[in-house]
Amino acid sequence: YIPLRQKKGPVPWHYALALFLSLIPLLLMKWSEVTTLSLFSFLGLSYLTFRVAQIIIETYDGLISSLSLPAFWAFLLFFPTFSAGPIDRSRRFEEDFRRRYTREEYLTLLGDGLEQLLIGLVYKFVLSALAFRLLSLCQPKGGLLLALAYGWCYGIYMFFDFAGYSRMAVGCAYILGVRTPGNFHLPFLSRDMKDFWNRWHITLSHWFRDYLFSRFLMRGIKGKWFKSRLSGACWAFLLNMLVMGAWHGLTLYYLLYGLYHGVLLAATEVYQKK
């Protein structure tokens, strides 16, 4: 798509076709999850799709004018983050890919990487295991208090399990000279739901914010789809989280999860703006 964009300019249907084609493997995989058909799936497909879609979107916007094949394939197949993120951006990645560190700079990066890797190991294999043991003691059918305790323990288990993996991925990336962004920042200290999604699975929520939420909202404002910017933001939150829920899985559970968070984010926006 990059050579076509350079030659023909920002042609909307070229962009739409390229973006749609990049999403086909992910759509087939999600469809196969809710049917008996095993159409298409492999490890890391979702995150590979995010990377390709980001390049196409930013190429159409004119933010990317060229991308060398070595940098392109290194970005797509970078093994520390290939299977489950964190989700990097191609322009930021390429800067690190081309950078030549001094000995002192790399030793600092190596130390930071080893620290992230060690913390990730403790999160994933010690604290996550302890949280899982607590989880096994709390049966959600044992009454309201036990159900609440189960919910809290499950949230803590999820955090240490995924944050541990993410820190290990970041640590490995640092060791290889790539400053991959982190995925979590004290999410349980969030002030509200908007703050929570700026702290939990950060690279995913920011990807959806930049490439779905903001674009839908700005298009709606320009097209006068909404009565006010506030109502537009509410609709954008609902769409954003529904799509995020569908990305997790095309099941009623995940769609309700997306709708629930969309409503909470919209309600937070209304409360803060009024």
Where are each of the predicted segments found?
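Membrane-embedded transmembrane alpha-helical bundles that form the catalytic cores
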Residues: 1-274
